Amino acid sequence: MKTIRIIGAGLSGCEAAYYLLKKGYFVELYEIKTIKKNPIQHYDYFCELAYSDSFRSTDLNTSVGTLKKELELLDSLIIKAAKYASINQNNELVVNRIEFSKYITNYLKTFNNLKIIEQEYLNIDLNIPTIIAIGPISTPSFLTNLKKIINKKNLKLFDTVEPTILKQSINKNICYSLDNNLDYLYCDLNKEQFEKFYNALISAKTFNSPLKNEIKLLEKNNYFSIESLAKNKQEFINHFKPINNNAYITITLKKDSVIDNLYTIVNFQTSLMWNEQLKVFSLIPGLENLKIMRYGVMHKNNYINTKKLLNLGVQLKTNKNIFFAGQIIGVDGYVESVCSGLISAINLDRYLNNKKMILPNKNSTIGSLYNYLLKTDSNFNPMRINWALVDLIDGFELSDNSKKFYSKRAIELIKQYLKKINYK
């Protein structure tokens, strides 16, 4: 019986373990939390959640709802657990966190081919097939050892994300480009518009992190949010110098390096609550009908340069025994972490059986996420699933009425993927 190691019993690690245990591998699952908990951990069960509502919508018209459906078709343990522990009946999947974690822990423990090792995993053995599925608050000792095999330049420790918006929600009659260079668009604010925007920004509510002093930690490392910058009004004004002589300030939008349908609001990394981001940033002229596809966040995180380090099987290019899963590869969100664990396990199994490693089609939600991660540039920020990551269907621009067609296509593509990998 072939031995596989999985480092981390979070969402991605447990999803990977479940798949490989079913395949008959002997799985060594390393988890340190029973002997050393990080600041946001409280229980000894696997897959401890910080929030009960982070599985988000079950509506198939949403990208995350479709992603959960794709995972369900792939027999996801985590989705089974979430449904078991669900505490509501509407379109939001809210779970009892303790019951959710208990379900997964107890289910995995029924496998005789699982060995749970409750200790810190320090020395990465390159000769043993391994999935590294660590979370955003990993131990310094493990990160030190990880840097030895990937080079410390390829590991980021903080997440400072600017809001990413849908191109079609930008008013091109107000926002403009220079010399027809559509890589950048510009939004001018006169003094009256600026004052309204500025006052809304400084009075907006910020996210309350479960990690104590997280914002201070970020600022200590020279990562400042747009709301922190706004504490000094004149400095804020100087930061957004006008391009047009008639403007008081100018805000820049930058096209995404992979997806033409997305733009980021430059220098707007933020800890504002999501509803506040929509309210405040829609005050920018040209963004009145703003659709945010990925909200800005700022928090402690560990993630690697996926495009540079990993191949299409999420396998380390320099050592074929090492695979990665979870937030470490640059996915953002609970459900996204689940799918990364499953894909890593599928491809590790295929690698060990001398089969070609494959990903789902890029127009499935799972495939679109990997297509983005494996193509984006080295300065990317973690991405969560959204419909802008898939190719547009001819005649169907992204809208509330057209999303059902995108969902139907994605689910059909996952069914084709199941046949391709002979999933049982």
Swiss-Prot record:
Alphabetized Gene3D superfamilies for the sequence:
FAD/NAD(P)-binding domain
Q: Which GO terms describe its biological process?
A: tRNA methylation; tRNA wobble uridine modification
The Enzyme Commission number assigned here is 2.1.1.74
Where can this protein be found?
Cytoplasm
Query: Which Gene Ontology CC terms are recorded?
Result: cytosol
Q: Which reaction does it catalyse?
A: uridine(54) in tRNA + (6R)-5,10-methylene-5,6,7,8-tetrahydrofolate + NADH + H(+) = 5-methyluridine(54) in tRNA + (6S)-5,6,7,8-tetrahydrofolate + NAD(+); uridine(54) in tRNA + (6R)-5,10-methylene-5,6,7,8-tetrahydrofolate + NADPH + H(+) = 5-methyluridine(54) in tRNA + (6S)-5,6,7,8-tetrahydrofolate + NADP(+)
| Major localization class | cytoplasm
Q: Name the needed cofactors.
A: FAD
InterPro entries associated with the record: FAD/NAD-bd_sf (IPR036188), MnmG-rel (IPR002218), MnmG_N (IPR040131), TrmFO (IPR004417)
- The superkingdom listed in its UniProt entry is Bacteria
Molecular-function annotations in GO: flavin adenine dinucleotide binding; tRNA (uracil(54)-C5)-methyltransferase activity, 5,10-methylenetetrahydrofolate-dependent
Q: Which UniProt keywords apply?
A: Cytoplasm, FAD, Flavoprotein, Methyltransferase, NAD, NADP, Transferase, tRNA processing
The answer on whether this UniProt entry bears the keyword Transmembrane reads no
Residues annotated to bind FAD: 8-13
Database matches in Pfam families: GIDA
Q: Which family does it belong to?
A: Belongs to the MnmG family. TrmFO subfamily.
What this protein is reported to do is described as: Catalyzes the folate-dependent formation of 5-methyl-uridine at position 54 (M-5-U54) in all tRNAs.
Q: What is this protein called?
A: Methylenetetrahydrofolate--tRNA-(uracil-5-)-methyltransferase TrmFO 1
Provide the species name. Answer: Mycoplasma mycoides subsp. mycoides SC (strain CCUG 32753 / NCTC 10114 / PG1)
* Gene responsible for this protein: trmFO1
